[in-house]
Amino acid sequence: MTLRQAIDLAAALLAEAGVDSARCDAEQLAAHLAGTDRGRLPLFEPPGDEFFGRYRDIVTARARRVPLQHLIGTVSFGPVVLHVGPGVFVPRPETEAILAWATAQSLPARPLIVDACTGSGALAVALAQHRANLGLKARIIGIDDSDCALDYARRNAAGTPVELVRADVTTPCLLPELDGQVDLMVSNPPYIPDAAVLEPEVAQHDPHHALFGGPDGMTVISAVVGLAGRWLRPGGLFAVEHDDTTSSSTVDLVSSTKLFVDVQARKDLAGRPRFVTAMRWGHLPLAGENGAIDPRQRRCRAKR
């Protein structure tokens, strides 16, 4: 059997199993085992039965709807390649729209950037790499409440200035030392409505804690918007991803705080409504106003 024949058979098996990107996945799995790029597969001479046996096994796993990224162990996201696997949300191409927006913004020379619900560290690490490629500095903080996700994030953030904080973004008094200090805040929080029907790769393999955002998908988004109102300095910038059914709800939520201007609904690379951006305006909220922390309250300490 030739490699081309093996890939043809794999693509047919994956298509029969309901994998939309059957041919692409079959080629990527072959390239992964071959240790080469997908475009260089025609130049690869497989070593024999041992290679084809491993290829058959990994294709069978993909046919069982194990995510491609779990089988390969990595995913490309903007300028970086991230380690991913069981227990962490796999970054999606649609989130690169937030990355593109964020990298186009004018920021101070050494901005403070926060990635809330960082997961694998995708946005935080990609923003750090983007600025490093331009010779620019930043202080970047990634926040997540999952130990497993943070294990991946630490691996992905190695060699970057990204700081990781273990904390729950729904905690009302979270990190008050950031109040009024942040120049850019981005977030891809859990936002899928609880009753949504998902593909097997997502439903069976992504952690549910990283997917579902309550009955309407807005529970964690609401908490993140509250944090943005506190943490961003006047003029600070905000972007939050949402389900493609909740764009209007997210715009209304951000606008209703009366703390933001230039609230805009934006689309992902496929043209679907995907995230909302805004600018923090005016004075910082007083204690107890719009989710601000009353100094008489007990200060919450996040485990770093």
Swiss-Prot record:
Binding site for S-adenosyl-L-methionine: 144, 188
CDD domains: AdoMet_MTases
GO biological process: methylation
InterPro entries per UniProt: DNA_methylase_N6_adenine_CS, HemK-like, Methyltransf_25, N5-glutamine_MTase, PrmC_N, RF_methyltr_PrmC, SAM-dependent_MTases_sf
Catalysed reactions listed for this entry: L-glutaminyl-[peptide chain release factor] + S-adenosyl-L-methionine = N(5)-methyl-L-glutaminyl-[peptide chain release factor] + S-adenosyl-L-homocysteine + H(+)
EC class: transferase
EC number(s) stated in the UniProt entry for this protein: 2.1.1.297
Entries under SUPFAM superfamilies matching the protein: S-adenosyl-L-methionine-dependent methyltransferases
Binding site for substrate: 188-191
Keyword annotations from UniProtKB, A to Z: Methyltransferase, S-adenosyl-L-methionine, Transferase
Any GO molecular function: protein-(glutamine-N5) methyltransferase activity
Function of the molecule: Methylates the class 1 translation termination release factors RF1/PrfA and RF2/PrfB on the glutamine residue of the universally conserved GGQ motif.
UniProt-listed NCBIfam families: hemK_fam, RF_mod_PrmC
Family classification: Belongs to the protein N5-glutamine methyltransferase family. PrmC subfamily.
HAMAP family: RF_methyltr_PrmC
Name under which the protein is recorded: Release factor glutamine methyltransferase
